[in-house]
Structure formats: C-alpha cells, structure tokens
C-alpha cells in the first residue's frame, strides 16, 4: 500500500508539473520562442505519458538473472495481465522516446544556432519519425506476449500467490532488451550533451566573449543543458539497480521497488530545466516583468546575435 501511495504521488506530480510546463510553452511563449516552445511541448508530452503509464501499472521488477518478473499493482490489474504488460512496455518505450528527443533537441539547438529556425510542422514530423521505430519494436513484443505462458516463480522472491505476476520468455527478453536500450540511449544523451555544450562555448568565443549579452545567453543555455544532463542519471540508477539484482549482488527485498521509482524521477525533474533557467517562463511564474532588453537573451533568441541588424526585443505573450 505504501508503494502504491508513493507511486501515485510521483505519477501525479510528474503529470502536473509537465502539464503546467506545457501550458507555459503553448500560451506564454513569445513568437521568437515558437520553435523552442514546440520542442518543450513535445518533451513534456512524452513526460506526461510516461507518468501516466507509471500510474497505470505501478510495477515492481524482480530478477535473479535466471528469470525476470514484473509485478503490477496499479489500475491495470483490473484489466488483466495483457493490459499490464502493454502498460509496462509503453512506460519503458516513452522513457526511451524521451531520451531520444533530448538528443534531438540538442541537434535542433545547433540547427537554430547556425542555420535557421525549423518550422513547427517539421519538428512534429521529426518527433513522429523518431518515435516510429520504438513503437514498432514495442508492438512486436506485445504481439508476441502470451499471458497464458507457464513460468516458475522462485521461492527466494517471496511473492504471494495472490499477486498478479507477469513472467515467461517474452517478459524476460523484452524487459532486459528495453532496459539495456535505455542505458545505451542515456549514454548517447551524455555524448550529445558534451557536443552541444562545446558548441555553445565555441559560439560565445566566435561572437566575442566581451559581449555581456552573449555571455549571459550562453551561461543560461549551458545551465539548461547542465540540468538536463542530470536527468539520465535516474535512468542509470534504475539500470544499475536492475543489473545488481540480475547479478545477485543485492537482494530483491527492497531493490524490486527502486527500479521504477528511479525511472520516475526523470520526468518529474525535467520541467525544472526550463522553469528555473529560461528567464521568460520564470518571470511569468513570479510575475516579474523585466525590461525588454534583459529578456532578449531567451533560449531561441540566440541566432539574432549573429546579425547585429536583427532586433531581439521581445514582448510578453
């Protein structure tokens, strides 16, 4: 019961924070920030779906290396094992899509910096294209799942017979595959972070490090990505807990609760990277109206510094 309560609090918090961030991005972003608001909207949308699936399943993951069991305790249990397995797969898939979109957002920032602002339609199209492989992969696993497949529950897990338990060959292979994919994608996020951070610093040098506006802009951009790179650490934490259980380095008594909880903190913390470090959104929340010239260093105004004839004066949305 305590685990379900904790999962509910985390899921509701994740949905609420990301819905609020989506509201800010859609309704409070000035015109000059539209490309970035689209990027933020897509990111928060996947975070909302991740949190919703977490609530739907409220899963524990147990393994000793020879078997992997998923114990759902959420609303999906009323619909049966297939619904819970679908929810389990959707949650892991949305987490992966979230990480992939983080990498894509870094690439888009480079594109905005050195080429031009992409259209919102192109951003949505790219997001859909990036999601398709993950969903096809997930659909293949779901199609192969057999809720009637027999499997053995090790006595060492201490699971009651009254629990709804998902197990078997497909659960084993799909879970270990997707968790490994999450780990690999998180590593790619770190690589992309190092690249975009160096790009921002190089841009500041090219534009002249003696310009205060460029200094402030890049400092804020670096703060955003520094915060965002912290998000995959929760995926790493969940992965290493799972790996420790898998290798029998830790007992399952407490570890079985920690994998999903660790994963949940990534969508919960994500909105703060924008709320805390994008001045426009922070000013909207605090009701602080700063002069237009101080607001010109928002995230998507960066390209204007390449051309001194371009005005970056922004107005409230």
Curated annotation (Swiss-Prot):
Spell out the subcellular localization from the entry. Answer: Membrane
**Transmembrane stretches, by residue range?**
5-25, 38-58, 83-103, 122-142, 176-196, 227-247, 258-278
Span of the secretion signal?
none
Write out the GO cellular component annotations: membrane
Membrane topology, from the record = Multi-pass membrane protein
- Which UniProt keywords are given for this protein, alphabetically ordered? Membrane, Transmembrane, Transmembrane helix
Q: What InterPro entries does this protein's entry cite?
A: 7TM_GPCR_serpentine_rcpt_Srd, Nematode_rcpt-like_delta
Q: What is its main location?
A: membrane
Q: Does the keyword Transmembrane helix apply?
A: yes
Q: Which cysteines share a disulfide bond?
A: none
The record ties this protein, via PANTHER family, to:
SERPENTINE RECEPTOR, CLASS D (DELTA)-RELATED (PTHR22945:SF9), SERPENTINE RECEPTOR, CLASS D DELTA (PTHR22945)
Homology family = Belongs to the nematode receptor-like protein srd family.
- The protein's name is Serpentine receptor class delta-26
- Give the species: Caenorhabditis elegans
């Amino acid at each position: 019961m305590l685990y379900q309560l904790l999962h509910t609090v985390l899921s509701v918090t994740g949905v609420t924070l990301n819905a609020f961030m989506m509201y800010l991005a859609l309704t409070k972003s000035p015109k000059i920030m539209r490309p970035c608001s689209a990027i933020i909207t897509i990111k928060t949308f996947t975070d909302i779906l991740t949190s919703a699936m977490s609530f739907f399943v409220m899963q524990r993951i147990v393994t000793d290396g020879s078997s992997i069991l998923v114990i759902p305790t959420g609303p999906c249990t009323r619909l049966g094992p297939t619904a819970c397995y679908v929810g389990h797969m959707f949650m892991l898939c949305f987490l992966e899509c979230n990480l992939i979109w983080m990498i894509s957002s870094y690439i888009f920032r480079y594109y905005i910096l050195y080429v031009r602002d992409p259209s919102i339609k192109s951003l949505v199209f790219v997001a859909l294209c990036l999601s398709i492989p993950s969903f096809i992969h997930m659909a293949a696993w779901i199609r192969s799942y057999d809720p009637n497949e027999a499997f053995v529950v090790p006595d060492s897990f201490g699971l009651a017979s009254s629990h709804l338990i998902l197990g078997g060959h497909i659960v084993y292979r799909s879970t270990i595959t997707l968790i490994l994919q999450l780990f690999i994608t998180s590593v790619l996020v770190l690589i992309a972070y190092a690249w975009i951070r160096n790009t921002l610093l190089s841009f500041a040098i090219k534009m002249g490090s003696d310009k205060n506006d460029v200094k402030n802009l890049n400092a804020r951009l670096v703060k955003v990505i520094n915060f965002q790179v912290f998000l995959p650490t929760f995926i790493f934490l969940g992965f290493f807990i799972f790996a420790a259980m898998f290798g029998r380095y830790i007992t399952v008594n407490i570890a079985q609760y920690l994998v999903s909880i660790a994963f949940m903190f990534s969508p919960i913390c994500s909105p703060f990277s924008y709320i805390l470090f994008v001045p426009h959104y922070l000013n909207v929340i605090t009701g602080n109206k700063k002069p237009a010239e101080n607001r010109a260093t928002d995230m998507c105004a960066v390209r204007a510094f390449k051309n001194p004839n371009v005005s970056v004066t922004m107005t409230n949305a």
